[in-house]
Amino acid sequence: MKATYLNSKHKDLGGFMVDFSGWEMPLHYGSQLNEHTEVRTNVGIFDVSHMAVFDLDGEKQEDFLRFLLPNDIKKINGQNKAMYSPMLNHEGGILDDLIVYYLGNKSFRIVSNCATREKNLSWLSKIAEPFDVGVDFKSDYSILALQGPNSHKFIKSHIEKDISKFSVHNVDDVMIASTGYTGELGYEIICDQEKGIKFWNEFISNDVQPIGLAARDTLRLEAGLNLYGTDMDETNTPYDSNIGWTIDLNDKDRDFIGKNALEEKKDSKKILKGFYTEERGVLRGGAEVIFEGGSGVVTSGTWSPTFKKNIGFCRVDKNCGEIGSAVLRDKKITLKFSNTNFLESLK
């Protein structure tokens, strides 16, 4: 298995290590519940250095990205901002989801999921070639995510001023962006490994709780954030994955990969919904969801530490209404449908 440069640090802190897409990563450090609650109420630090970082080089980076992605990078060029977007194939299917960061000097950085890194490198390089844009995979970079309502207290000494959501601060080869995967105020730090170790040691010495993958999953589910490979893949489009808002058609003359195919699929009969239940039992991916006049399937499910009930996402027919059901261990469970962001729908 591969390991991040902080592997020994995780073990020293009591991390329970598991195989995650070929990487030895901490599932938790003793209590998933405590880690989840710490991020919701205070602050926590994640090592997400298994994710893939690609830096671009060349004069036509903007042109390349405008063709590569359905979301339009032009809206952040020159603004020290970050932008979320799916990356599509020519049929409009989702190859991955990623964040693009503007680094200054007309240069961009892409961060994508770890399980798709090799596939993404090949795809990015292929699409970039006609634009004469280089794609540099940064295999030796550190990515830390400092997340939680008190995260600013621990990052303020490293940034010149407060930065708003989806903003980027890039100085001395350290990029700090106000992005994250928890639904809380937070910052993601990308730098070389030596600096990454210094950041990690600083936060841990100041009693910031390390957070494992288990809490990361429950946090993102509560916040309504999709997990690629679980809630969406190449068989899905943004329209049936609750990210149709990323398809930017404001510039009618702009072409992008999958545009024509999406025109034919924009009236998808399926949508990604949230569900919750007061009954016991966690519905996992693959479970069938039934409602009057249709059906669907669970993509993600968990017990919510914040709301003390079982929640999840399901891909269902648009006519699903407000109530559905599922069967768990031969017992019928009543489900209530909602939007996928439970921090909004259940607050």
Placement of each model-derived feature along the sequence:
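Acidic, proline/glycine-enriched N-terminal capping motif
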Residues: 1-88, 93-95, 214
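Conserved, structured C-terminal
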Residues: 1-21, 25-27, 33, 103-347
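Glycine-rich, Trp-frequent "lid" loop and neighboring beta-strands that shape
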Residues: 99-100
